[in-house]
């Protein structure tokens, strides 16, 4: 089979997947190494543009932790973390918003547009896209009294303005969302990007939620990739201590999304070129899919 015939064969192999996703929404959380490596940045942009051109509606939510950390260091503002979340005082919040909304967001928008897409950058403040409230975190330690952890201006999502997103999608745009929210009094909050992506996917009734990470997916106790997890199995993996560290909030976010009606959630290695296409348009995929069998019954 020559190269041209092989290419035609590959396109035909993708047809069932394209048909399945046509007209559907896919929410992608963009973060990790894929945001800082130029080759991976280009691969990401082209994957997103391809989705749009074949009739799928991609919505991007991005992080920016390393970029925020570098700017805070440059400004001699000390970074503090509690339970894996950045403590965000007023000065830090100003930097977070400046970096996420003014720099990272616009860089992503510019890259997609340069590669032939039509992206529009948004923060949660635009059209009250993301409404939020202060995150209240309580840490329980055995018989000790519960400890209330004050993270400052770290928020949790209370609402998503889906009309704004669907209006942009209907006009052919690719929304790119910075995870900054606002409460009813106008206070600004720093929100975990995975959490925002999950909330956006659930609110939109998206077909898929995709989280890009710096690992191959969810690993078992032997460090072997788990290709598929039901939410019950995921809960058990947490209880058994199989899931640790930063993977816990990612899996929790996916579980909440599929429980709310998203068909599947995926955790992928963003360091792999074309990881989005490989996961969505091949039978085996390359990462971990999280499903709710009960919800689909």
Curated annotation (Swiss-Prot):
Biological role: Catalyzes the ATP-dependent phosphorylation of N-acetyl-L-glutamate.
Cellular compartments annotated: Cytoplasm
Family to which the UniProt record says this protein belongs: Belongs to the acetylglutamate kinase family. ArgB subfamily.
Organism: Solidesulfovibrio magneticus (strain ATCC 700980 / DSM 13731 / RS-1) (Desulfovibrio magneticus)
Superkingdom of source: Bacteria
Biological classification of the source: Bacteria, Pseudomonadati, Thermodesulfobacteriota, Desulfovibrionia, Desulfovibrionales
GO CC aspect terms: cytoplasm
Binding site for substrate: 64-65, 86, 190
Record field: catalytic activity: N-acetyl-L-glutamate + ATP = N-acetyl-L-glutamyl 5-phosphate + ADP
EC numbers for this chain: 2.7.2.8
Primary location class: cytoplasm
NCBIfam families: argB
GO molecular function: acetylglutamate kinase activity; ATP binding
Biological or metabolic pathway of the protein: Amino-acid biosynthesis; L-arginine biosynthesis; N(2)-acetyl-L-ornithine from L-glutamate: step 2/4
UniProt-listed GO biological process terms: arginine biosynthetic process via ornithine; L-arginine biosynthetic process
PANTHER family: N-ACETYLGLUTAMATE SYNTHASE, N-ACETYLGLUTAMATE SYNTHASE, MITOCHONDRIAL
Pfam family, one: AA_kinase
Record's keyword terms, sorted: Amino-acid biosynthesis, Arginine biosynthesis, ATP-binding, Cytoplasm, Kinase, Nucleotide-binding, Transferase
Residues with site note (Transition state stabilizer): 29, 250
Cross-referenced InterPro entries: AceGlu_kinase-like_sf (IPR036393), AcgluKinase_fam (IPR004662), ArgB (IPR037528), Asp/Glu/Uridylate_kinase (IPR001048), Glu/AcGlu_kinase (IPR001057), NAGK-C (IPR041727)
CDD domains: AAK_NAGK-C
Cysteine-cysteine disulfides: none
Protein name: Acetylglutamate kinase
């Amino acid at each position: 089979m020559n190269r041209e015939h092989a290419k035609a064969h590959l396109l035909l192999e993708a047809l069932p997947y394209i048909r399945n996703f046509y007209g559907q929404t896919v929410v992608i959380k963009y973060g990790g190494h894929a945001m800082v490596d130029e080759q991976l940045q280009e691969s990401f942009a082209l994957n997103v543009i391809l989705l749009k051109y074949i009739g799928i509606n991609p919505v991007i939510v991005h992080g920016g932790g390393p970029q925020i950390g570098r700017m805070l260091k440059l400004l001699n503002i000390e970074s503090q973390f509690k339970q894996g979340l950045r403590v965000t005082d007023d000065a830090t919040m100003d930097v977070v918003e400046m970096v996420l909304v003014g720099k990272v967001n616009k860089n992503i928008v510019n890259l997609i547009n340069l590669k032939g897409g039509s992206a529009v950058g948004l923060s949660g403040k635009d059209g009250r896209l993301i409404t939020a409230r202060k995150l209240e975190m309580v840490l329980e330690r055995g018989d000790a009294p519960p400890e209330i952890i004050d993270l400052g201006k770290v928020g949790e999502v209370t609402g998503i303005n889906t009309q704004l997103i669907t209006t942009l999608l209907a006009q052919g745009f690719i929304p790119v969302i910075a995870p900054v929210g606002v409460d009813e009094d106008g206070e600004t909050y720093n929100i975990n990007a995975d959490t925002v992506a999950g909330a956006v996917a659930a609110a939109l009734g998206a077909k898929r939620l995709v989280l890009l990470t710096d690992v191959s997916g969810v690993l078992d106790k032997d460090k072997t990739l788990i290709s598929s997890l039901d939410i019950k199995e995921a809960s058990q993996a947490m209880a058994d201590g199989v899931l640790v560290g930063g993977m816990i909030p990612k899996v929790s976010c996916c579980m909440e999304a599929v429980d709310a009606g998203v068909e599947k959630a995926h955790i992928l290695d963003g360091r792999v070129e074309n990881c989005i296409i490989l996961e969505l348009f091949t039978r085996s995929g390359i990462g971990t899919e999280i499903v709710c069998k009960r919800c689909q019954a």
